[in-house]
Amino acid sequence: MGDPTKQALIAEDAVPPTGLLGFIGKFTIIFGARRELWLTFLLKFLIYTAYSVTNKTMVLWLSRDLGFSDQAAGAIVGWGWAPAMTVFTLLAGSLTDAIGLKRTFYLGVAICTVARSVMVTTTIPWLALSCGVLPLAIGEALGTPVLLAATRRYSTTAQRSMSFSLIYMVMNVGYLAAGYIFDFVRRSSGHFSLFGFEPTTHQQLFMVSLAIEIIIFPAIYFLRRGEEERAKSEARSASLVGGIAQTVGQTATETVQLFRRLIGQSAFARILVFFLLIGFLKAIFLQMDYVFPKFGDRVLGMGAPVGRLANINGWMIIVLAPLVGAMTQRLSAYRMVVIGGLICASGVFIMALPTTWFLTAAASGFGQWLGHSYLGLEGAIHPYYIMTAFYLIVFSVGEAFYSPRVYEYAAAIAPKGQEASYGALAYLPFLVGKLLIGTAGWVLAAFIPEQGPRRPELMWLIFALAASVAPIGLIVFRRYIRVPEAGRQDDQ
């Protein structure tokens, strides 16, 4: 799935298996893990489910509950909420080091709980944004590095590779759960009053996220109890407020030093352009949360099961990512990114084709199964359901090819001893994608307005052309931005 956390979870080198028993042992070794590691997996699932439900609801809530236009809602999400999360995530790593893992966990969840409560109870725009959306971005960002740190801390060296693989899988399961929750609440459309308060459908979705957030507190408590002996040995002396204040200055200094160190290197400019191009692919992934819900309501019908549709991507990535990785180990990361980018872009073009071309497919056995059995629809199946399924299937194949290899490429070309510095740039494609998706509100308003004639195929053509920028740019500028990868033989 398309989030920076998903790309940061790169497992360390695994211990080579020795025969069948060794291979099986790589999986069963996790059964002996500490209780805290399993609690970390639970926390990851809960945190990512709550985040994904909120993410899918955000643009609909901004427009229908707060009254923002498509353009304003897109700008708030693309140029405010999403980039703020990226920036705060970069700061959160140092904060975790300064105040400790437990405090960061509690701080992040507490901020999210207060922020979600505000978003549930108010429809005053300035209050919802300043006391809800912005603090939520801070709270959500605190969870990313602390979960990675917890996974590393609570796993042994032998368990570490499988631990990171499992937490990646748990993240995808959380994404899938959010899709089903999103559709269920929207379809239920239950209207109820709670002490005179009648929440909208979108506030009900935020209530689900809030309930999940509250459940996280006891999980952290038990994690804390199991960590007491280790915590005593760490002997952190920094107070919470002092740690935060110290972190702001420390992180700013480290960031300046990082870029000073990198700017003078020839590989830095190349990896920068490489990541900027990848940002166009990330924008297409992000539109599934920030554009697709409105497309579904306006083209497919109010309450369309867009969550289940989007889950096609999640299911396929869980299956395809390890298979593609195993079958393409000998290919260079750059070549894999180009191939994957071409496949992804071709998938988006499916959505720009005439819907009449898919009427037969909609009436076929596959179309009936997709619409009636998987999506739970009644009556005739709109061709866009079939087109979306085909688009997501093709896009998922491309994502399985390119997504894991993007960060492998950064590590492969990094000068020795600077792998972490180059890895810190891993958030750049998502940041670029989020900035690009901020313009989607104007595209949505132009081609799929809430009222008036609609031309969805033109919107998807624009998205397809945008996705094509990445593979075309990587091919055209290959001789300028490609750097030989350590251990690869197909760099010519």
Language model features with spans:
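Intracellular loop-helix junctions on the cytosolic face of multi-pass helical membrane proteins
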Residues: M1-R34, T157-S161, F182-D289, P293, ...
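Helix-loop boundary and gating motifs at the non-cytosolic
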Residues: F31-A82, R270-L277, L281-F295, V299-M302
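Hydrophobic core of transmembrane alpha-helices in multi-pass small-molecule transporters
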Residues: F45, A115, W126-G143, A363-Y402
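Loop-to-transmembrane helix entry
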Residues: F68-A82, F292-I318, H382-F390, S421-A424, ...
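Central cavity-lining transmembrane alpha-helices of secondary-active solute carriers
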Residues: G78-S94, N311-V324, V432
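C-terminal ends and interior cores of transmembrane alpha-helices
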Residues: A110-I124, I343-A380
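Intracellular juxtamembrane helix-capping segments at the cytosolic ends
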Residues: L142-T156, A400-P415
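Glycine-rich segments within core transmembrane alpha-helices of 12-TM secondary carriers
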Residues: S161-G190, L210-E213, L425-A440
